[in-house]
């Protein structure tokens, strides 16, 4: 899943509309449902739903600042996921 953690809604919309929507060839509304872009709590909600549906592995592709994004994911998202 594409990953970009940010609390800046404008930046999240920019990543969705200017980067991911064209790459995926899908409308922003559809892309928004299928990627982890935005605040950590929203990403936790999406991943918890996948986990509840039986998904056990998710591959992450940070769209920028790989090391920073993966560190944020480790610090802000993973601890909140159901075990």
List PLM regions with ranges.
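Glycine-rich beta-alpha junction loops
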Residues: 1-7
């Amino acid at each position: 899943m594409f990953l970009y953690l940010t609390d800046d809604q404008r930046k999240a919309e920019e990543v969705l509309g200017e980067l991911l929507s064209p790459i995926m060839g899908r409308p922003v509304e559809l892309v928004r449902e299928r990627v982890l872009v935005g605040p950590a709590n929203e990403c936790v909600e999406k991943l918890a739903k996948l986990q509840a549906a039986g998904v056990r592995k998710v591959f992450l592709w940070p769209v920028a600042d790989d090391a920073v994004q993966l560190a944020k994911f480790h610090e802000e998202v993973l601890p909140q996921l159901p075990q």
